Amino acid sequence: MTDVTIKALASEIQTSVDRLIQQFADAGIRKSADDSVTSQEKQTLLTHLNREHGSAPDKLTLQRKTRSTLNIPGTGGKSKSVQIEVRKKRTFVKRDPQEAERLAAEEQAQREAEEQARREAEEAAKREAQLKAEREAAEQAKREVADKAKREAAEKDKVSNQHTDEMTKTAQAEKIRRENEAAELKRKSEEEARRKLEEEARRVAEEARRMAEENEKNWSETSDSPEDSSDYHVTTSQHARQAEDDNDREVEGGRGRSRSSKAARPAKKGNKHAESKADREEARAAVRGGKGGKHRKGSALQQGFQKPAQAVNRDVVIGETITVGELANKMAVKGSQVIKAMMKLGAMATINQVIDQETAQLVAEEMGHKVILRRENELEEAVMSDRDTGAAAEPRAPVVTIMGHVDHGKTSLLDYIRSTKVASGEAGGITQHIGAYHVETDNGMITFLDTPGHAAFTSMRARGAQATDIVVLVVAADDGVMPQTIEAIQHAKAAQVPVVVAVNKIDKPEADPDRVKNELSQYGILPEEWGGESQFVHVSAKAGTGIDDLLDAILLQAEVLELKAVRNGMASGAVIESFLDKGRGPVATVLVREGTLHKGDIVLCGFEYGRVRAMRDELGREVLEAGPSIPVEILGLSGVPAAGDEVTVVRDEKKAREVALYRQGKFREVKLARQQKSKLENMFANMTEGEVHEVNIVLKADVQGSVEAISDSLLKLSTDEVKVKIIGSGVGGITETDATLAAASNAILVGFNVRADASARKVIEAESLDLRYYSVIYNLIDEVKAAMSGMLSPELKQQIIGLAEVRDVFKSPKFGAIAGCMVTEGTIKRHNPIRVLRDNVVIYEGELESLRRFKDDVNEVRNGMECGIGVKNYNDVRVGDMIEVFEIIEIQRSID
């Protein structure tokens, strides 16, 4: 029997695919809906079901009802319909094993009897034919002897009776002729009868041989087809029901034919009866066959599906992420084949593991299928396209980012421009997050972004460079180019933003502006007087020198860039900074790029959405709208967005929520799919990782940028022996949930410019958690370094403390060989490890067991004194050897 799929088998036995798959799984066979099932697997399932639920019932009774309508002609040419219901009850009885064996023995005996009868019939026919031939030969011989005797007698009579008259001779000749003709006729009739008898015997023998061969063939087919009997209990009821349906259709068809033939040709009633009777006999034969008759061929129950002879290439549609099992179903192959293909490509995955689009595309193409990549952001594109944007572009204010090394005077320079003292508000005078301000000058408005200069704030500086039009690079004239200065240059070049250099602290006596120009020229920043494109302005944020020149240079550069933006229409911009305020909720600092942002607009911001409930400028004043290049703080988002996210005003809040949820799910799936895979090449590397200490940290900060900066800095401190693990991080105060998480994971609670609330402090006191507050990032990183250094295993170092020369060797019954020594260097101490040197080569390393001076045990012997040394488990001490005594000291390691 050909293989069938799980779906086809479930449809055949009228059960669900999931139930059949579960039954196969219970039987120890893992299958999916499109897998093929062999006859052996069917037999295994049947055996399992019989063992679990008991064998099939010995008797099966089917009750069938067939309803039909019969039109009977009535009076007046009218006909009325009569409802006919045919009820049938059929019982199928399963033979028990003893009866089956008895029937098999009877059939075997019947076949042997038929074979014996056939052989006896053939032998009897042969004997009869032989006897007839012998009788005919004997009769022929008698006739020939009689004819010869008659001829001799006739000749004698002719010779002796020559005198008989002519009439007598004529009468005798006539008599002989008639006798000869009668004998010839009798001989021909006997030969004809013998030929017919031989033909009849041959026909009987041939018929017996044919019947015996047919019986043998039917028996062999019945015994050699285990498929028909293997799934007998599974398919008997369906086959019987199908046979009854066929029987009903045949009977109904016969009735229809009989009625039509009766109306057209009344004389053929007998033919109708014979035809319907033949149909019923055929239906009964089908039912008997459905019950498992042994002389029925199983071709009618064979499956029509044939397994494809070659692989079928399909069009596989792949989304952003897909599991291995889904990919296998799309390609109509088993999951194990996909896993094997991935192992050949160097990646290991389970059948439920999520893989990204690129990996799925490689696997599908490797298996010979055509890949169609599906774009899943149609909803997002539809929402973004349904926006009102103005057509007329107007000049806008430049967005200027002030970048440079830490303590080079960036914030002080901006403070002088704004005529405020903001630097005092920053902890330690260091800018902890991006400040966005716009100032009005005599020549126009300028928007400033102040970025941190510390090494930990790389991502914040990168965001500032991407959202800006002009970069003002602040370099201290007395300090020159520093690491963060170089990094700021790289960010500006990556964003393709023009650079204006402000040489600050020009009023200091040790200021050297020419040195700054020379150092910057090494990184591609050339002044205009040297043929470059960058303007150099000498300023002093403390004295206010050159500030107007710097503003003029910025506006001049903006005129060259011809900065324009659409003022009317729905606004779009970028998140500069975000944080969680305890009284106001999520707050985002947004820089508007195009359009006008109004209070009450529906905004979509990365994974978050919401309606703008309030807008404030950098001074904390309420505003109703904000145009291009204006930074504002907005309230009303569903959560704290990530810094750098795009902010877009949309029409429908419901659509905005759908897009935000879709982005969250997509981000989660992509993040899961791109996690580190267990590849073959790094499997052993993962297995050989030894004992690694971990410093678990729960981090809370005031703004999102500080969280990112501190997380990056702490993760960079990880080494092969000690790893920093950020268990949880977020914006806002330390809550009870954070304290519970720290207690469960044995983590340190770190608060950066935030404090713990009352409920969190109770948990911290109850669990004795380590809680630390910081306001300067330097102190935080240094203390985490110290904590990590305490987890490093100490370094072991051997320090030589004494050296003794063997002058003589004595024998002791208790310690064996005793070396009489002179201490030449340092001090010899008892129970310390020693080395025995011979010709400056170490020949033994062990422990000093006994140390005596004269006959007294001593703990140490100083330089220039004689002593006796007993080496533990070593007796091969010779004169001239050197005994070196050392001790092992531990050196505490630290993280640089």
UniProtKB/Swiss-Prot annotation:
Which positions are annotated as binding GTP? 404-411, 450-454, 504-507
Its cellular-component GO annotations read: cytosol
**Ranges for region G3:** 450-453
* Cell location: Cytoplasm
Give the primary localization class: cytoplasm
Q: Which domain of life is it from?
A: Bacteria
Region spans: G5: 540-542
Q: Which Gene3D superfamilies match?
A: P-loop containing nucleotide triphosphate hydrolases (3.40.50.300), Putative DNA-binding domain, N-terminal subdomain of bacterial translation initiation factor IF2 (3.30.56.50), Translation factors (2.40.30.10), Translation initiation factor IF- 2, domain 3 (3.40.50.10050)
Q: Residue limits of the tr-type G domain?
A: 395-564
Stretches the record annotates as G4: 504-507
Query: Keyword Magnesium, does the record have it?
Result: no
Q: Where is the composition biased (Basic residues)?
A: 256-271
Residue ranges for the region (G2) are 429-433
**HAMAP family associated with the record:** IF_2_B
The protein, known as:
Translation initiation factor IF-2
Give the species: Klebsiella pneumoniae subsp. pneumoniae (strain ATCC 700721 / MGH 78578)
In the UniProt record, what gene is named as encoding this protein? Answer: infB
